[in-house]
UniProtKB/Swiss-Prot annotation:
This is Tetrahydromethanopterin S-methyltransferase subunit H. The complex is composed of 8 subunits; MtrA, MtrB, MtrC, MtrD, MtrE, MtrF, MtrG and MtrH. It is an enzyme of class 7 (translocase). Keywords: Methanogenesis, Methyltransferase, One-carbon metabolism, Transferase, Translocase. NCBIfam families: mtrH. The gene is mtrH.
Length: 316
């Protein structure tokens, strides 16, 4: 637990603040909805889903945020332009302020979402996910023409998962690339780049993933985060072991939540914690660590931005 010498940028997107010194702001929690094989979705191509179930899940997150003081963001995943537009319509109808990630495994879907958010006037809340080494020119062009000003900038280096490899992909590019991801994001008109350290599996770069958090904050002064739960989900031993146990979820969830807490204590500003169904487990745990970070921030002379609503005050 520490204080960075470099000025730490704070970006406000849809009323949620990302960045700052460790403990200065509560950690931002990012849920995922409409992911592959999400039980509430009945047609992934058309975006047909159980609206009542989705709203119940969302309201649970809102309630836990109210209780703990941790802000939240929603990651909206779509497999087709039609489906992601339908999901966005639903979300902006039930929530008129919260920021959301527009995400898909397909670049054309992400591009369509950025364009759609511009058309319906919610681009100021949209966060493009992501600008990465495989982004194609079509997506770059649409993003540049859109009103979207925030994006996840992914530090994934397919050939070098070390801290240096992650830094290189951000600053100079990688194999076949002539520009770093940060330069590309700037050329796309992104004013609020949120770096994702690209969490790697245990045994294949998980250590450098965590070490890259304070390294990047010290180097760039930008908000840093990631989908750290992927470390647990990609852990072959745990996947096999939990199947031998009577309660697989009880075996799995401590590791899932734990990956986030390790990253949080290392300085991660936001956590893409995965399926929104895990909301009850993640919020109290992250709030607990935020209390520790808040106490440390005070000790180091960091002024907590909204002390009354920070877990260090709200929950003690």
């Amino acid at each position: 637990m520490f204080k960075f010498d470099k000025k730490q940028e704070v970006f406000e997107i849809g009323g949620v603040k990302f960045g700052g010194q460790p403990g200065e702001f509560p950690t931002v929690l990012v849920s995922t909805m409409f992911y592959a094989r999400h039980k509430i979705v009945t047609d992934e191509d058309k975006g047909i889903f159980d609206r009542a179930a989705a709203e119940t899940l969302w309201n649970t997150q809102v309630s836990l945020s109210d209780a703990t003081g941790n802000p939240y963001v929603n990651q909206i995943v779509g497999e087709t332009p039609e489906s992601i537009k339908r999901y966005i319509d639903w979300f902006v109808e039930i929530d008129d302020r919260t920021p959301f990630l527009i995400d898909s495994s397909a670049g054309n879907v992400r591009a369509a979402a950025a364009q759609y958010c511009t058309e319906i006037g919610v681009a100021d809340r949209a966060i493009h996910n992501s600008i990465n080494a495989s982004i194609e020119q079509e997506e770059i062009d649409v993003l540049t023409e859109s009103d979207v000003e925030a994006a996840i900038v992914l530090a994934f280096n397919a050939t070098d998962p070390t801290v240096k490899g992650k830094m290189d992909i951000l600053e100079v590019g990688g194999s076949g690339l002539t520009k770093g991801m940060l330069q590309i994001s700037e050329e796309c008109g992104i004013k609020y780049p949120l770096i994702d350290v690209a969490a790697m599996p245990l045994g294949a770069g998980s250590g450098p993933t965590i070490r890259s958090i304070p390294t990047m904050k010290a180097k760039f002064g930008l908000p840093i985060g990631g989908g750290y739960h992927n470390m647990a989900s990609a852990w072959d031993w745990l996947r096999k072991f939990k199947k031998t146990q009577p309660d697989a979820k009880a075996i799995y969830m401590p590791a899932d939540i734990g990956t986030n807490l390790v990253a949080q204590i290392a300085g991660s500003d936001y956590l893409l914690y995965g399926p929104i169904e895990n909301v009850n487990q993640i919020f109290p745990a992250v709030a607990m660590v935020d209390i520790m970070l808040g106490e440390t921030a005070k000790d180091l002379g960091v002024e907590i931005a909204d002390l009354e609503n920070h877990p260090v005050t709200k929950l003690t």
